[in-house]
């Protein structure tokens, strides 16, 4: 009997760690969120609109983010070309988990609020919608996340997570391939509401280690029906830097000045 007990204890030593440290979809997505957290950031970005024939139209933008009291605000400013220069886009997160969004269009010289019904519309001709710009795909309280399997993406080991939104969403679900080493998304499929068709696919083209953290340096979003793509490349990024909250106001949105 004593030997049997010893044997069972040895077996338990192998089994219990696996049970205690079992990985769930929610735990993985929480790691994804934690990996990407920063009190503030400033990014210079090269954005390319890629037609199905390969023609590319380039934009240069700057994006600032500031998180205060757990709420993240983002301002995006278009720097070039001249046709979109000084276009500014503001997203402010609310305590109820929703977002307020405004856009300033220089040609109209006014600020326009983005209604919830406009969330699925294209952001500045890109393959990202207004809702994508305030995406809660990775939020553990905005979707149910299930670990489906593990597989390899571009020679990197990944968790495959199915995320079904709890609240209103433009998508029926997303499937996310999360890098097991860096916890960065390597690939995301965005599905129709009936779950039968992949509408858009996001691919991480390059990851990099900068400012003491892993980041997605280049990503491409493709609308599968049209084969139109949008590539976003981070030229420079700084994190946890002093940031004036005046940038995240409708006053700055309209004037381009911090009052």
Regions found by a protein language model. Give the residues of each.
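Gram-negative outer-membrane assembly/targeting C-terminal domains
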Residues: 32, 242-259
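A short, amphipathic edge element
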Residues: 26, 57-58, 135-146, 199-201
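Gly/Pro-enriched, hydrophobic low-complexity segments
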Residues: 79, 90-92, 100-104, 110-114, ...
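Bacterial N-terminal signal peptides that target proteins for export
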Residues: 1-11
